[in-house]
Amino acid sequence: MKEKATAFAVGATGYPCIEILARGHTHWSMALLGGICVLALVWIARRYPGMNIAVQAALGTAFITAAELAVGLVVNRALGWQVWDYSREFGNVLGQICPLFSFYWFLLCLPVFGLLRLAARWKAKRTSEV
C-alpha cells in the first residue's frame, strides 16, 4: 500500500509540474490524473517486467491518452472547466487528445519505465541481501 501511495504522490506532483513547465499553468484535476497514470505505469512495469521498454512506453502512452480523453470529456466538455483544448492540433479528437501530445507522452514514458526497472532491480538486490 505504501508503494502505491508513493507512486500516486509522485504522479500527482510530477504531472502538474510537467504541465507548469510546458504550459505555464495547471489545474488540480491534473494532479489526480497524474497519480492515476503513474499507478498504471507501475502496474505495466510489474505486469510485463521483461517487455521491451519501447513497448511498455507504448502501452503507457495508450493508457495516458485514453485517460486524458476520459478526463477531458468530463472536465472540459461536460463541466466546461476549459483545462485544456487541443482543437487546433492536427488529428485531435474532440479537442481533448492529439497525436503530438501522445508522442510527447511516449517520450516521457521511456525514462519513467527505465527508472521503474532500476527501482525493481534495486529492490530485488536489497531483498536478496537480507
What are these regions (language model features)?
Residues 1-130:
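Aromatic-rich, lipid-facing transmembrane alpha helices and their immediate juxtamembrane interface loops
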